[in-house]
């Protein structure tokens, strides 16, 4: 194959654009979606999730996160060029057309729908509000003062879907975990929004960081605290083994470190603090994994 041929160069360019639109080169969003989904799968299956179900949720999560990123860039195409962090995205650079992005979104959603085939009808039904939330979230930044809460709903729907897929029902512990994850998402995405706060104020985009104003850090920590409290409530409801409870002091320490970091409100530090939430995700997964092991 001639690597310098016009066709190859064209295909290589489009592949690069699609990878960047999907954020396939930045897995943090997929991880933050996967952790709560895995928490739910392990709890619902008593630590032994069916491999087909696990694969369906893992692949489906990646595809829907990718679709969400593409439609987000489509929605923000007139603003990204004015924001320091997003000025090099494909739309901001004029490298992608609107129709192209919409077709890519539809294709990714279709692939994600195929992941539902081995799952039950209740899971299919619950995928509809999940799809609606994922595709409409980017547009809430025009009118909703706390779009990060809406994102929290979208990022949490994998939890009841996981319980539905495993047990064909959505018990109370699923909704406790759902509420906890909404608060966690609101916390870390507000930190993410703090990194863009100055730019968002200039262009008129609504975010929780803008809405909370000088109380943004207090709001973040209240959400973190509520998240941890609900995880403790969840532990009490499920009769968690001792290993589950070891996560709480570790997570509290990680949350305190985040507080110490974001007090500076420095753009890069806020972004790095957002990334650090991956640690909280895997700590809770390890705790739930250990709980299901020792509870047997």
From Swiss-Prot:
Q: What does this protein do?
A: Catalyzes the prenylation of para-hydroxybenzoate (PHB) with an all-trans polyprenyl group. Mediates the second step in the final reaction sequence of ubiquinone-8 (UQ-8) biosynthesis, which is the condensation of the polyisoprenoid side chain with PHB, generating the first membrane-bound Q intermediate 3-octaprenyl-4-hydroxybenzoate.
Q: What is this protein called?
A: 4-hydroxybenzoate octaprenyltransferase
Q: Which Pfam families match?
A: UbiA
Ranked from the top, the taxonomy reads:
Bacteria, Pseudomonadati, Pseudomonadota, Betaproteobacteria, Neisseriales
Which Enzyme Commission number(s) are listed?
Answer: 2.5.1.39
Cross-referenced InterPro entries, in alphabetical order? HB_polyprenyltransferase-like, Prenyltransferase, UbiA_prenyltransferase, UbiA_prenylTrfase_CS, UbiA_sf
State where it is primarily located: membrane
Q: Which PROSITE patterns match?
A: UBIA
Give the catalytic activity: all-trans-octaprenyl diphosphate + 4-hydroxybenzoate = 4-hydroxy-3-(all-trans-octaprenyl)benzoate + diphosphate
Record keywords, A-Z: Cell inner membrane, Cell membrane, Magnesium, Membrane, Transferase, Transmembrane, Transmembrane helix, Ubiquinone biosynthesis
GO cellular component, as recorded: plasma membrane
One GO term of the biological process aspect = ubiquinone biosynthetic process
Q: Where located? A: Cell inner membrane
């Amino acid at each position: 194959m001639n690597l310098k041929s016009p066709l190859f160069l064209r295909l290589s360019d489009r592949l690069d654009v699609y990878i960047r639109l999907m954020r396939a080169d930045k897995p943090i969003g997929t991880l933050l979606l996967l952790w709560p989904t895995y928490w739910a799968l392990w709890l619902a299956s008593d630590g032994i999730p069916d491999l087909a179900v696990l694969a369906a949720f893992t692949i489906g999560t990646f595809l829907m996160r990718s679709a969400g990123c593409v439609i987000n860039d489509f929605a923000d195409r007139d603003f990204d060029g004015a924001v320091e962090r997003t000025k090099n995205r494909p739309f901001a650079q004029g490298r992608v057309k609107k129709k192209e992005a919409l077709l890519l979104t539809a294709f990714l959603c279709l692939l994600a729908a195929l992941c539902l085939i081995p799952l039950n009808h209740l899971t299919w039904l619950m995928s509809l509000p999940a799809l609606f939330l994922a595709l409409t979230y980017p547009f809430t930044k025009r009118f909703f003062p706390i779009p990060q809460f809406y994102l929290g709903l979208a990022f949490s729907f994998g939890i009841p879907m996981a319980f539905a897929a495993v047990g064909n029902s959505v018990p109370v512990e699923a909704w406790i975990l759902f509420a906890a994850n909404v608060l966690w998402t609101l916390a870390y995405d507000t930190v993410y929004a703090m990194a863009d706060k100055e730019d968002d104020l200039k262009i008129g985009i609504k975010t929780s960081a803008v809405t909370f104003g000088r109380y943004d850090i207090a709001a973040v920590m209240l959400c973190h605290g509520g998240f941890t409290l609900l995880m403790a409530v969840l532990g009490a409801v499920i009769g968690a083994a001792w290993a589950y409870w070891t996560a709480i002091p570790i997570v509290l320490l990680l949350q305190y470190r985040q507080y110490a970091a974001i007090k500076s409100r420095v753009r890069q530090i806020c972004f790095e603090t957002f990334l650090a939430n991956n640690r909280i995700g895997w700590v809770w997964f390890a705790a739930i994994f250990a709980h299901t092991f020792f509870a047997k």
